[in-house]
Each structure stands twice: as structure tokens, then as C-alpha cells.
């Protein structure tokens, strides 16, 4: 038996060593890696080169007079966008329903900060040239003020590298989607080659960058989602050539993305001077006089709201990445929203969801705790067997197996039911970590009978570390109710687990800590009930 335990210990150690990297990556403790076949350094790559399907032409394009550059504003119930008439690049994109802090007078979230303007978000590259700098532009129309259900279009006409360029940007009052229809035509009678690229740029989307909520460059290409958050990798650059549905910059809660309709393209991403830059470039296209083709590209500037993203084109819904156990996380988020509709508090909704999960797994947990209690009663007899046959491991294992058989105890009975619940924990972890509903959602808001702010944002850590410390105490108490490990080394390791988890959870979003704390309390109650009946 001891030999078997030694072998098991070695195997488990190997699993921990190999699996830790995957676990820490999944949990967000270390940046995710990207398959080597998808990674190419863009350091030496020229500025976004693009290829495009035949754009629209206006037979010999008529001459036009460039207009003086000025700001153009688009206002909807969801956001306020400010563009420049010289090519349609973004100057601001402020989200009306999301703010930088929990204070009532907190500024709205601005996805395009001033330092990002220099990389021309919503910019257009033509034959490698930044059209907003090298072209001449005229703007047709005025500001847009859209009410619910309305759409509006801004039209920018330009002359860039011998091509007449017409950008039509359509805005939707009920969505964060911006749709561009791009028309190209030679300014003379001869055909011209056009290479078009769409640019994007933003600063960090997570002020006070947390290891659990990093700003990263992400993309959905060739049917799979990928992302890079490592500063070193992003400063070197990312270069992807493939079938690209969308690419952009995102955090757990917000996304700025470009999504070309014809998806064969080259993606270039880079972090430079604190600004995340993305360009999606289409292949070269011959543009003939009289060409009427239209190039369509979608953009997303807004929160990662599931319903809106799932309704958007180009698989933008895949930006909400819930990891390996997404099939578990998605229904859990739905249940969380269901409870919230009735209680109006996400902290309470998390507790109700935890209770529901505990009830579902009650039979398995009951079996596990009952098996552990039987093992606890067997420990004195097992200790005597180890002492009696300390020099004869084979005989010791035989006697221990005889005891297990006599008292009908399965030594693994306490662990196996728990293992079944691990995927649910990881699924709920990802669900709570990526649920924008928890951003600035209060639980208690203030310490009782005081004005001290506490647990006013379930997406932020507990400012006074009360919940993680109490959680650590519950883990210690739960450990006291659990039979001690027979192996002294294992017992010492288990003794330090509450300390390790407490430090680990200190900076966790408080919503996650509330779940874990509530789960521990329910587990202690269940163990106490089983002990009382024993």
C-alpha cells in the first residue's frame, strides 16, 4: 500500500508541476500563450499593408474641394463619439452607461483617450499610406443625434494616392456596432492597385491594471480565439495572416475591435508608448474605372455585453472567452442574471447561486464527507498497522486493505466526488471574472452603521480584506473537521493550504471571494450535520 501511495504521490507531483502552468494561465495568474504557428514578429514589418476586394468606383471621379477640418459628434443613448472630418478618425468614444468609478460624478469610460488619437482609431490606410495625413478630405453632413431605434450615416470623401475614397460610417442607436461601407475609384481613366487597411488604437482599458483583468490584443481567426497580454510580446509585435473575423483590444469588460466582412487579411498588433495598436489589412485589389464594388467593415466600441455581442456579425460574441469550461460558465451566468431579477443585488444573487450549486451537489458531497468520516474513525487502527509492520511494507499494505474491506471504506471515496465538482468551480470562476454585470455592482456598499465604503464593487478586491481573511478562517475550520492525512508530509502541506489560499484571494474580485466564502460556510454546515448524525 505504501508503495502505491508513493507512486501516486510521484504521479500527482508530476501532474502539479506540468499542470500548474495551464492552471495559472487559465485562472489569469500568468498571461496566456499563443500557438507558435500564429506568432510572427511584426517588428520589421512595414506599416499595415492591406488587400481588398474590388472597391467601388465613380467613373473618372469628379474633382472636389477639401473642407476645413473640424470635429463631428455622434450622440446616442449608449455613447457619444467624436470624429474628425479629415478622414473620419475617432477622437473620443465615451460610453454613457459605464463610468470610471463608483461615484455618481465619475467620468464616463472613454475608449479613445487623448494619447491614442495619434494612432488614428477608425483610420483608413490606402496603399500603406495613412489617409488621414496624406489625403485631402471633404465632409458631407453634420452632427448626428440618434434616438432609440434610429441609425445615421456620416460620409467622408477623400483623394488619396490617386484614388477617390468615400467612407460611409453607419451608427446605430441601440448597438455599439459601427458599420463602414468603403467605395474606391481611380481618379483617372487607368486602373489602379488598391491596398486597404483598417486601424484601431486605444490605451489600457483597465486603469490600475490587475493581473485578473489585463488589457490585451485579441483576435478570432481561422475559427479559433487567441489573445496576447504579455507586454514584452506586444512590444515586439504580433503578425497573423489568415481568415480573420475580428481583431482588437479588450479587457474583461470592454472591447474595441475591427471586423472586416471579407475575412482573408493580415493582422498587425503592437504596444507602443502605452498605446495598443491594431491594423487589419486586406489583399491587393485592382480597381477599375466604373467599379461599383463596396468594401464592408464593422467596428465595435463598447462593453462586452453578451446579448449585443452575440447579435453582432463576424463572431464578435467570441470575445467573451470563458475558457475550457465555457459550456458550464454560460448557464451559470444566465442563472446569476435570473436571481438578480428577483433580488436586485448581485452579491445576494451570487449567494443564491452558490446555494443552488451546493444543493445540486449535495448527494456527492454527502458521500464524500461520509467517506472521510469513516476514514477518520479508521485512523487509529491504520496507525497501529503502520507501527506493527513498519519494516514490512507488503504485509502492512495487505493489513490496511483488509481493514478497508472489513469496514467497507474506500480510501479514495472522499476525493472522487469532489473531483467531479472541480469543472463547476472553474466554470463559475470564469463566469464571475468576465461578467460585466458585476462591474461596479454593489453588495453591501457601506460598513453597517457607517459611511465607510465596503464591497461597493464586486469586480474589485475587498478594500479591507475582510472577506478573504474570513474565507481563510473557514478553510482552517473546515480542515479541522476533515480527517487528518495519514502521511505527515501531506498533513503539513494541507495545514498551510488556508494560508496560501488566503494570500491568493486577497486581490481577487470580491464577487469571487463571496462565492468561495459562502461555499465554505455551506460545506462546514454539511460536515457538521454529518458528524452530528454519525
From Swiss-Prot:
Residues passing through the membrane, by range: 7-27, 319-339, 342-362, 413-433, 493-513
GO terms classed as biological process: protein insertion into membrane; protein transport
Membrane topology: Multi-pass membrane protein
GO molecular function: membrane insertase activity
GO cellular component terms listed in the entry, alphabetical order: plasma membrane
Keyword Transmembrane assigned: yes
Keyword Endoplasmic reticulum: no
Protein keywords: Cell inner membrane, Cell membrane, Chaperone, Membrane, Protein transport, Transmembrane, Transmembrane helix, Transport
One Pfam family of this chain: 60KD_IMP
Localization annotation: Cell inner membrane
UniProt cross-references to NCBIfam families, sorted A to Z: yidC_nterm, yidC_oxa1_cterm
Functional description taken from the UniProt entry: Required for the insertion and/or proper folding and/or complex formation of integral membrane proteins into the membrane. Involved in integration of membrane proteins that insert both dependently and independently of the Sec translocase complex, as well as at least some lipoproteins. Aids folding of multispanning membrane proteins.
Subunit note: Interacts with the Sec translocase complex via SecD. Specifically interacts with transmembrane segments of nascent integral membrane proteins during membrane integration.
Family statement: Belongs to the OXA1/ALB3/YidC family. Type 1 subfamily.
Protein name: Membrane protein insertase YidC
Lineage, uppermost ranks: Bacteria, Pseudomonadati, Thermodesulfobacteriota, Desulfovibrionia, Desulfovibrionales
Name of the gene this protein is made from: yidC
